């Protein structure tokens, strides 16, 4: 016997969260809980404003229609990426095919003061990997901050993300302030420039490796080995079903590229599932999941060690 519930939720964000020049005051999304017999599976559907093509209102309509079809015996996945991902996670939990083992080691995220990151990294055991958002301020300042971090922590490897913010000139201004002796410790810089060709040129001219992120979701993207390209960053909420995520990881690994499972600012429930997906598909790579502290609460499932208060399922708005 099948049954299902759908919940709508909204989490207040910290004041300083800006996405694509828009301040994100709340994180809005949906949960689906599928039950069959004694088993149940959960999934999160939370399109990311400014990045997802769909809104959460679009996703809600598609999800409710899919759930009604599933209750009637139809299992075909929806095409909308955020719904396909959340539904496929719920189905995988239901079928017990999503392993429980999780990689909760997140690369800490630096959004502002580099001193905060230095203190956080001092207590980090093992491999020291951190992520820094660049492109929000002047490129020269970004270069100086990155250089400072690499100089202060000799065993640090940085992942940088520019979200296509730079012109070729700004990319050169950034690189000018990063000591060439430190550049090999930049694990990769995600999408430095507005076009892929400009990003490729940046990698050639600066000897700083790059990674594809937004490019993966463009219709003309193909997985090929390219000089200067070291990694792909896979955001499942923006990608689609678990199977599609798995295919992209497999394609990247076949080319010798690092595949990083990365957050789209999901709630704690979604983040714990991403940690499980990372342990399963990319066991040797620290995922990019350090986004929970941007929110003011956890929901339904806790992220280990987080002091944020937990909102129980009973407090959520039930739609079905």
Swiss-Prot record:
GO MF: magnesium ion binding; O-succinylbenzoate synthase activity
Record Gene3D superfamilies: Enolase-like C-terminal domain (3.20.20.120), Enolase-like, N-terminal domain (3.30.390.10)
EC number(s) given by UniProt: 4.2.1.113
Residue stretches in coiled coil: none
Active site per UniProt: 133 (proton donor), 235 (proton acceptor)
InterPro entries listed in its UniProt record: Enolase-like_C_sf (IPR036849), Enolase-like_N (IPR029017), Enolase_C-like (IPR029065), Mandelate_racemase_C (IPR013342), OSB_synthase_MenC1 (IPR010196), OSBS_N (IPR041338)
Lineage: superkingdom: Bacteria
Pfam families, A to Z: MenC_N, MR_MLE_C
Reaction catalyzed: (1R,6R)-6-hydroxy-2-succinyl-cyclohexa-2,4-diene-1-carboxylate = 2-succinylbenzoate + H2O
Keyword list, A-Z: Lyase, Magnesium, Menaquinone biosynthesis, Metal-binding
Record bears the keyword Hydrolase: no
Binding of Mg(2+), residues: 161, 190, 213
Pathway recorded for this protein: Quinol/quinone metabolism; 1,4-dihydroxy-2-naphthoate biosynthesis; 1,4-dihydroxy-2-naphthoate from chorismate: step 4/7; Quinol/quinone metabolism; menaquinone biosynthesis
GO BP term, pick one: menaquinone biosynthetic process
Function statement: Converts 2-succinyl-6-hydroxy-2,4-cyclohexadiene-1-carboxylate (SHCHC) to 2-succinylbenzoate (OSB).
Entry's family note: Belongs to the mandelate racemase/muconate lactonizing enzyme family. MenC type 1 subfamily.
Protein name per the record: o-succinylbenzoate synthase
């Amino acid at each position: 016997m099948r049954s299902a519930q759908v919940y709508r939720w909204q989490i207040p964000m910290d004041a300083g969260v800006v996405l694509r020049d828009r301040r994100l005051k709340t994180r809005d999304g949906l949960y689906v809980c599928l039950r069959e017999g004694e088993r149940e599976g959960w999934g999160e559907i939370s399109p990311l404003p400014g990045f997802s093509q769909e809104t959460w209102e679009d996703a809600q309509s598609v999800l409710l229609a899919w759930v009604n079809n599933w209750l009637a015996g139809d299992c075909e996945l929806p095409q909308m990426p955020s719904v396909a991902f959340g539904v496929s996670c719920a189905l995988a939990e239901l079928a017990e095919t999503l392993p429980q083992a999780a990689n909760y080691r997140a690369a800490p995220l630096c959004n502002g003061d580099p001193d905060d990151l230095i203190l956080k990294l001092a207590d980090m055991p093992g491999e020291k990997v951190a992520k820094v958002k660049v492109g929000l301020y002047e490129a020269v300042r970004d270069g100086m901050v990155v250089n400072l971090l690499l100089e202060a922590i000799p065993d640090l490897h940085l992942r940088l993300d520019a979200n296509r913010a730079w012109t070729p000139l700004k990319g050169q201004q950034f690189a000018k302030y990063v000591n060439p002796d430190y550049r090999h410790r930049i694990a990769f810089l995600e999408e430095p420039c507005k076009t892929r060709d400009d990003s490729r040129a940046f990698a050639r001219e600066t000897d700083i490796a790059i990674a594809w992120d937004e490019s993966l979701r463009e219709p003309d993207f193909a997985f090929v080995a390219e000089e200067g390209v070291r990694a792909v960053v896979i955001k499942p909420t923006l990608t689609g079903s678990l199977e599609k995520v798995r295919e992209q990881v497999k394609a990247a690994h076949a080319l010798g590229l690092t595949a990083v499972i990365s957050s789209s600012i999901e709630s704690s429930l979604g983040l714990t599932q991403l940690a499980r997906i990372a342990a399963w598909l990319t066991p040797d790579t620290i995922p990019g999941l350090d986004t929970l502290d941007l929110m003011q609460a956890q929901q339904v499932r806790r992220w280990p060690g987080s002091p944020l208060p937990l909102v129980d399922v009973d407090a959520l708005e039930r739609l079905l």
